[in-house]
């Protein structure tokens, strides 16, 4: 299938050149105007390292993913909180936007917008959501600090282990993958999201980011109906004798943790930036409309993770970040062990990384 460029423009915002290439026509001009405003705002308030910004609007991220799979191992790229492993690239394909930049040369950055993902999420014609998303993506390179750099020296090692219950063996590879992704997000990559959100808030986009988070929480509430359908499907397996109630409880707990614990990375930065009103509004929505419908361990575990996110220092070494991450990992491992899952996971500092 051929890809056709339907819009090309070249603009100058202060000392920054903005180059726009789009496969989509509808809705692109308002998005470019928002992009101009964000570049202007950040470049006037803080150190802005970019002489140029490439702004790509793609119908989907298929071409980008093919390119990254070829080139990821050849450059020092920071992809908006992702490493570029196959699992991370697969997740990247469903993102509405991403900022890809070379950490060794911040003279420019590449913003990619995923048209289909934006449509699915309802963001495409929502100016506030677009502003929050773009401001967040541009904040990634601005938020680089000792702790975010230290995260690139850590890796997660998950030991193969037996499924806690024989009927779960067929699902255990998927379960282990979900948990590994969650641990990486909360214990290794957390700083990248926390500091990026904090820069976004302190850069003047707190209202737009809060509205974006409220919108996403509303979507989570809407999706609770899907969780109830899953409960019914699993109960049918219990009735057939394929699963026990304990096994169902473990599966639901893992799913709830994987979806909801990362919200701490979105809400804690409002506290860190002194915007407690927005943080309390988001937390109230969680506590009233979401947590009561989940496994009872999710709320307490979220509180522990969110408190740790508030305390994360910006000047951590790899060893210090590993220690911080292990505290969260130990709590997660302990909670899963109580439900019969013995997850063997370790955070390691790569040899030669600065301590």
Show where each model-derived region lies.
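Zn2+-dependent metallopeptidase catalytic core
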Residues: 25-55, 76-78
């Amino acid at each position: 299938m051929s890809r056709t460029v339907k819009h090309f423009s070249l603009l100058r915002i202060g000392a920054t050149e903005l180059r726009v290439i789009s496969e989509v026509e509808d809705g692109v001009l308002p998005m470019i105007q928002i992009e101009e405003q964000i570049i202007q705002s950040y470049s006037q308030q803080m150190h802005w390292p970019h002489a140029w910004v490439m702004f790509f609007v793609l119908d989907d991220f298929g071409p980008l993913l093919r390119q990254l799979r070829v080139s990821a191992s050849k450059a020092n790229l920071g992809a908006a909180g992702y490493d570029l492993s196959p699992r991370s690239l697969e997740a990247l394909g469903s993102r509405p936007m991403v900022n890809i930049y070379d950490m060794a040369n911040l003279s420019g950055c590449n913003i990619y917008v995923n048209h289909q993902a934006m449509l699915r999420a309802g963001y495409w014609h929502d100016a506030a959501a677009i502003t929050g998303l773009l401001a967040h993506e541009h904040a990634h390179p601005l938020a680089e600090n000792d702790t975010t750099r230290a995260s690139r020296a850590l890796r997660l090692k998950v030991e193969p282990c037996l499924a806690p219950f024989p009927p779960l063996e067929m699902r255990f590879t998927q379960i282990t993958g979900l948990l590994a992704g969650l641990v990486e997000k909360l214990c290794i990559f957390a700083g990248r999201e926390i500091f990026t959100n904090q820069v976004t808030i302190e850069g003047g986009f707190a209202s737009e980011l809060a509205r974006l988070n409220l919108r996403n929480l509303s979507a989570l509430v809407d999706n609770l109906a899907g969780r109830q359908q899953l409960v019914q499907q699993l109960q049918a397996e219990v009735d057939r004798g394929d699963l026990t109630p304990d096994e169902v409880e473990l599966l639901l707990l893992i799913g709830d943790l994987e979806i909801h614990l990362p919200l701490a990375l979105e809400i804690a930065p409002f506290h860190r930036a002194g915007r407690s009103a927005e943080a309390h509004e988001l937390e109230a929505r969680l506590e009233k409309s979401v947590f009561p419908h989940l496994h009872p361990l999710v709320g307490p575990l979220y509180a522990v993770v969110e408190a740790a996110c508030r305390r994360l220092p910006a000047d951590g070494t790899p060893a210090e970040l590993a220690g911080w991450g292990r505290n969260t990992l130990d709590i997660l491992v302990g909670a899963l062990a109580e439900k019969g899952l013995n997850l063997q996971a370790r955070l390691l500092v790569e040899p030669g990384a600065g301590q």
